[in-house]
Regions:
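C-terminal structural segment of proteins
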Residues: 1-326
């Protein structure tokens, strides 16, 4: 590991300008559970790490009548245990609780979880010069692709590793992006980019930009949500497949639905055809198995991951079934 500088920023302007001045060999750091791993593994070389830990308001949780504001440095353990989140945004609390181990959740942050890099073993190995690292080959295309994408992938078959992003997508969250000039906001679905749009990045952040907070609109009184995650080891693992579902139910009828998938696509994956199919249905008449199959109708599995098609369909069916039974 090569030596690098560490700077503690105290303002957004300072953080942004320091990052721009040292680009492309600068990175922001919050909890560091992902980026330090990349550096230690020899995947990433940096000249400077710019810490966001000193920014005002970055660790705040603000609940109001209009919704929830989460600072990007709020730890995952706080999200999982905050009573206002557990009661009003259960899918988010469940997603945060599912991440890694208690030790990592105590350090890992919301912003870091959203901006973490792929866990693809070809990308993470210094032995493979894959597309994600500027090479010419996706080595997962032909073999060794048990954990890779079945939806939304063409040339590069990574899956996005974030759990909380999937829940936030179902909850219609907004991401705030900051730089030295100010802030801009966007739906969380627009924050992530697939390899087909930008092979070398997973989100829209430009040099000098970072995420200071995330906003979630307050759900109506008839809204219920859930996050489910399938993984090989219950103790600590990334998702083989995950699903977040938010349903608004009035008079036994689903008036609004949002379903998001994780562990199966290069980005947290919306399934609008499922949202449309659920909306307007009486909860007693929902065919959850058909809904599950609809969620994976566009799946294109690789040589070793066809199991994800069945698994994901089952996960969607279970999640919807749980909510309509509440």
């Amino acid at each position: 590991m090569k030596p690098f500088k560490f700077e503690q920023a105290t303002t957004a302007v300072q953080a942004s300008r320091t990052h721009v001045d040292a680009a492309p060999n600068a990175r922001f750091i919050s909890g560091g559970t992902d980026i330090l791993g990349e550096i230690k593994e020899g995947i990433l070389e940096v000249n400077i790490l710019v810490s966001l830990a000193g920014l005002s308001g970055a660790s705040e949780i603000i609940s109001s009548d209009v919704g929830l504001e989460l600072g990007a440095l709020v730890t995952l353990v706080r999200i999982a245990s905050d009573q206002s989140i557990v009661e009003t945004y259960p899918a988010l609390a469940q997603a945060a609780e599912s991440v890694a181990t208690p030790q990592i959740r105590n350090v890992g942050t919301l912003g870091g979880n959203l901006c973490q890099r792929p866990r693809c073993w070809y990308y993470r190995s210094p032995l493979f010069d894959c597309l994600k690292k500027g090479g010419e080959t996706c080595f997962a295309s032909d073999e060794g692709n048990k954990y890779h994408a079945i939806l939304g992938a063409e040339n590069c078959h990574i899956v996005h590793p974030s759990d909380v992003a999937v829940a936030l997508l179902a909850l219609e969250a907004t991401v705030v992006v900051a730089n030295a000039s100010g802030d801009r906001q966007m739906p969380i679905g627009d924050f992530f980019v697939s390899p087909d749009v930008n092979m070398l990045a997973e989100n829209v952040l430009e040099p000098g930009e970072f995420v200071p907070k995330v906003k979630i609109p307050k759900p109506s009184s008839g809204t219920r949500s859930v996050y489910l995650k399938a993984k090989e080891r219950q103790a600590y693992d990334f998702a083989l497949s995950s699903v977040a579902v938010s349903l608004e139910v009035r008079d036994e009828t689903i008036t609004q639905a949002h379903v998001a998938l994780g562990g199966v696509a290069p980005v947290p994956y919306s399934v609008p055809q499922v949202d449309s199919e659920l909306t307007g249905q009486k909860i007693r008449e929902v065919d959850v198995q058909a809904i599950g199959q609809l969620a994976v109708k566009d799946a294109q599995p690789l040589s070793d991951n066809s199991y994800k098609v069945r698994l994901t369909a089952s996960m969607v069916a279970r999640a919807v079934s749980r909510l309509i039974s509440e």
